[in-house]
């Protein structure tokens, strides 16, 4: 899985292709070397990035502050770090594809 990596410090690094303005927020499936994610939030004033952070934190069972955007603040291609995600969260992410 090229889109999901474990860093040396134990955090997870995700490569995502984000589609803002969708009907609902959900993982779609592989998109090249990234995982495609639809976001219900519009790409205006950072709302999509905030929604992404909230969604990933809830999906992985971590606090919102544990999710940080590494790159792609204004792009659909994003790299995200998730700190403190346990083995259950890793298994859920791996099950996506």
From Swiss-Prot:
Matching Pfam families: DUF167 (PF02594)
InterPro entries for this protein: DUF167, YggU-like_sf
Record's GO cellular component terms: cytoplasm
Domain of life: Bacteria
Gene3D superfamilies associated with the record: YggU-like
Family that this chain belongs to: Belongs to the UPF0235 family.
Identification of the protein by name: UPF0235 protein AZOSEA09540
């Amino acid at each position: 899985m090229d889109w999901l990596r474990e860093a040396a410090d134990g955090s997870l690094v995700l490569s995502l292709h984000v589609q803002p303005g969708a009907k609902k927020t959900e993982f779609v499936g592989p998109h090249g070397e990234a995982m495609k994610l639809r976001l219900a939030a519009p790409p205006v004033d950072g709302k999509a990035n905030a929604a992404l952070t909230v969604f990933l934190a809830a999906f992985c069972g971590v606090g919102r502050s544990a999710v940080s955007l590494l790159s792609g603040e204004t792009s659909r291609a994003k790299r995200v770090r998730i700190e403190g995600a346990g083995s259950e969260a890793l298994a859920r992410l791996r099950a996506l594809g």
